[in-house]
A protein has these predicted regions:
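Phosphate-binding P-loop/Walker A region and its immediate neighborhood
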Residues: 146
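Charged, low-complexity intrinsically disordered terminal segments
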Residues: 2-143, 153-164, 170-477
Length: 477
């Protein structure tokens, strides 16, 4: 009798779990499996964007390639801010680099700087809830933290709409934008796993109405005020907790140590010798609602690439495309003589979903006419950039996959500048020198004599399972 009762309880728990899973699955599929088309308004807007791409510009820029430099430049912006700091990030952890950023932000707030932070509501649920380091910042009188689309299992129709933006603005005059999240994988040179990515720093001493810094600031204000963004634990009473006091003290001491070691560089506010002139900088963005999105950024990037005269070079960590996306690449390949893409090899890809889909669809990608280079550097490459001819560069958060195309908020910065283009080309080539070109027959062209990463049996099994169990959801990962 007792055993029978236990079986009934287990069965009831399992039934509830399956019902919840079915509810979540139905809500997600109904909302996100249908992909919106490009609107006439986007087509018209894209034509206008291209027509003003060469107008006079007062902004200067430089690309940030190394993770150690990326951390230092963020601290530098925060330390020298006088009035306002805006930080938007997909993921924010309280590891070594995350604590340094938290410490720098807390120090700025102590100086009277108004700090606003926006974090994706799924990642924050994992990394920030119950965390005294984040409570120490959110309870500060000069700090506001909001979460975009906070995770809610009762609303599966909003689950997949994530905020993937990554940028930092100081005083409405200088910003960093790119693909780096706010933790050790991307910032600093700490032991352990790393992801290689890329940012661009933009400076404008006297911003004008249509400068990119104002485009980005206006974008932030719009998303900050929308109803899907809710405050994160802003009670001032949190500061009285012993765990929070201890965390704040640790942040202050850790930041002061980092500041003293790097003081000369951090306090340098003259960017003139470090940056390059630009003719025009344009911000491309996806819709900011949480439903399935019109593929605005994908379309605009495609049109920019179709207008290339000689070359287009794409770097992306993942390639997960549908027919519309493949068709775009086919059109580019027909128009542009030199069209290539570099992505992680199956063995080198840190994302099992990206690795599995690429392994299955590599031949379909080759059929578009694009040349594929596989990165074999040992650490997963996370850079999201496009090089067009000798004067146009595109850097940001957009992956060449269906999630970036239809589900996430995304930002890409388009920069017209021969100097930035050359800097981007040099940065790309550093990674391409550890890559091999995939040939149509499945063999490789290996001009750099690269030793490929071993595809282990464990990775093979993982790829197989993802392909066969989750392939139906390839547009959701």
């Amino acid at each position: 009798m007792k055993r029978h009762k236990i079986c009934k309880i287990i069965f009831a728990i399992l039934a509830v779990f399956l019902c919840v899973a079915f509810y979540e699955l139905i809500g997600i599929c109904i909302t996100y499996k249908k992909h919106p088309a490009v609107s006439d308004a986007t087509i018209k807007e894209t034509q206008n964007i291209m027509s003003v791409a060469g107008r006079e510009n007062t902004e200067r820029a430089v690309i940030i390639e190394k993770n150690s430099q990326a951390l230092l430049e963020r601290v530098r912006l925060i330390q020298n801010a006088k009035d306002e700091i805006i930080l938007s990030t997909f993921a924010f952890k309280s590891d070594e680099s995350g604590k340094l950023i938290l410490g720098a932000l807390h120090d700025a707030a102590d100086r009277g700087v108004h700090v606003r932070i926006l974090v994706d509501g799924m990642e924050s649920w994992i990394d920030m809830e119950g965390n005294p380091y984040f409570y120490g910042l959110s309870s500060h009188e000069n700090v506001e933290i909001k979460l975009y689309n906070k995770a809610n299992p009762l609303k599966p129709w909003k689950t997949m709409g994530r905020m993937h933006d990554k940028y930092l603005i100081a005083d409405g005059k200088i910003y960093i934008l790119g693909g780096r999240n706010t933790y050790n994988y991307f910032l600093g040179d700490f032991p352990g796993h790393k992801n290689f990515d890329r940012d661009v720093l933009v400076v404008c001493d006297e911003p004008q109405k249509d400068n990119s810094v104002n485009q980005l600031w206006n974008y932030f204000e719009t998303i900050w005020e929308q109803e899907d963004c809710r405050y994160f634990h802003n009670s001032k009473k949190l500061a009285d907790r012993q765990s929070v006091k201890k965390a704040v003290l640790e942040l202050q001491e850790g930041y002061q140590q980092y500041f003293e070691v790097n003081k000369e560089k951090i306090c340098d506010t003259d960017y003139a010798d470090e940056t390059f002139e630009t003719e025009k900088i344009i911000l491309l963005s996806n819709p900011i609602h949480t439903q399935a999105k019109e593929p605005v950024v994908w379309y605009q990037l495609g049109e920019l690439m179709k207008n290339a005269k000689e070359r287009v070079k794409i770097h992306t960590p993942y390639i997960i495309c549908n027919d519309m996306m493949y068709n775009t690449w086919e059109e580019i390949a027909q128009k542009v003589p030199d069209f290539s893409i570099m992505t992680n090899s199956v063995a080198n890809n840190g994302n099992p979903f990206g690795a599995a889909d690429y392994a299955k669809n590599r031949n379909r990608i080759l059929e578009t006419g694009i040349d594929i280079w596989e990165y074999e550097g040992g650490y997963s490459y996370h850079g999201k950039s496009i090089l067009i001819d000798d004067d146009l560069s595109v850097i940001g958060s957009f992956n060449m996959d269906m999630r970036s195309t239809y589900l996430d908020t995304e930002l890409m910065l388009v920069i017209r500048s021969k100097e930035i283009n050359k800097q981007l080309e040099d940065g790309m080539m550093e990674y391409e020198s550890v890559s091999r070109q995939v040939l149509d027959d499945g063999t490789y062209y290996d001009p750099y004599h690269v030793k490929p990463i071993e595809l282990t049996e464990k990775r093979k099994r993982k790829v197989f399972l993802v392909q066969h169990l989750l392939g139906w959801a390839r547009d959701l990962f």
